[in-house]
Amino acid sequence: HFHLVKLGNDAVTKVRRRVTWDLRDRRGRKLDPEWANRRRLLRARERLSQKSFAKMWNDIMAEDHSGQILSAWIAKEELRTLLSTVRVGGDPHLTRHRLHRFLAWCIDSQIPELLTLAGTVDTWWPEINSFVRTGITNGRTEGYNRLVKQVKRVGCGFRNRDNSARRIRFHCTRKQRAATQTSC
């Protein structure tokens, strides 16, 4: 889920930067509306107040006559809507409808960054669909892998494999140990 939303946010950022360069032949500056609203573009729609949403929308509409930045933002929100299907139990009909709506938006826009995003989602759709249907992620595994790498990095090369394995198990079970200590 996180990685897909990050891909959507990265596409919005790439479109914003490219459009700014096309409009001004330079990077964005503080007074440029698309640069000033860059954080709002990355924020979820439900986390924007009506006032900040209206400001973002109107400022960008006034400057970007091609509408590419807002098209990218809408595509990102469509992707988030598709991923939110997991909250309603992964209804297959609703999932197919939202996937079609997302892919159609990206393809109809003919924006290169959105075409790349749509291609990535289409390529990884079987894996994404299994997440939407089941709601199961590999987030816990990735978290444990991060802990193992961190322990190895801090350990500066253990000489004893048993001590290395013991330290990794110690760090990976910290939450469970804290829960059992307080319940006794």
Model-derived regions: residue spans:
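Acidic/histidine-rich catalytic cores and adjacent linkers
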Residues: 5-9, 14, 22-184
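A generic structural motif
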Residues: 1-2
